């Protein structure tokens, strides 16, 4: 994959709630990585927890509204929403897809979601931002060749087992990338 100039890579950064607490190293390493690669992350300070799939157990409307708000925060910056959490990417990505489909198939539902956002003084969801995982941005936007050139300490010979999280690779029909 060819690289894009790193100076053009800007994202609305959604760290998620776990990276602010139990996995602070994830937040810190993402900050250090983005700085080293020249990727600009505009942190969405007013973002809410995505609900990690639990909101929809109570109400699909709740999950869609909370995450439409998060996406709308990125849309106000005219940037794609970027997260490093596979669960956040999965939940927010599915909401984004569901609301984009609602624009065509069920505009009344989208009006309901945006009405709830408006009641809270939030910008409406428009479906213009998109949701990316950090790994997708590194591979697809930054490029593997450019990334390889930045390696300062190769880990050749290191045997490891990667765990990306299930939402990063499944459900395949809902993801913008091939595994």
Question: Could you say what each language-model-derived stretch is?
Answer:
Residues 2-179:
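Iron-sulfur cluster-binding electron-transfer modules in prokaryotic oxidoreductases
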């Amino acid at each position: 994959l060819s690289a894009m100039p790193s100076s053009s890579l800007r994202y609305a950064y959604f760290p998620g709630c776990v990276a602010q607490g139990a996995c602070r190293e994830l937040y810190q390493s993402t900050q250090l990585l983005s700085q080293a690669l020249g990727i600009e992350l505009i942190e969405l300070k007013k973002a809410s927890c995505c609900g990690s799939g639990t909101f929809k157990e109570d109400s699909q409307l709740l999950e869609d509204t909370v995450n439409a708000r998060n996406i709308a925060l990125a849309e106000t910056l005219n940037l794609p929403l970027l997260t490093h959490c596979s669960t956040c990417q999965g939940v927010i990505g599915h909401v984004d897809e569901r609301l984009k489909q609602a624009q065509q198939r069920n505009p009344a539902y989208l009006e309901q979601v945006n009405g709830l956002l408006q009641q809270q003084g939030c910008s409406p969801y428009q479906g213009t931002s998109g949701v990316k995982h950090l790994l997708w941005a590194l591979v697809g936007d930054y490029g593997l060749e450019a990334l390889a050139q930045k390696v300062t300490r190769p880990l050749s010979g290191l045997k490891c087992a990667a765990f990306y999280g299930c939402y990063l690779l499944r459900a395949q029909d809902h993801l913008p990338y091939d595994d």
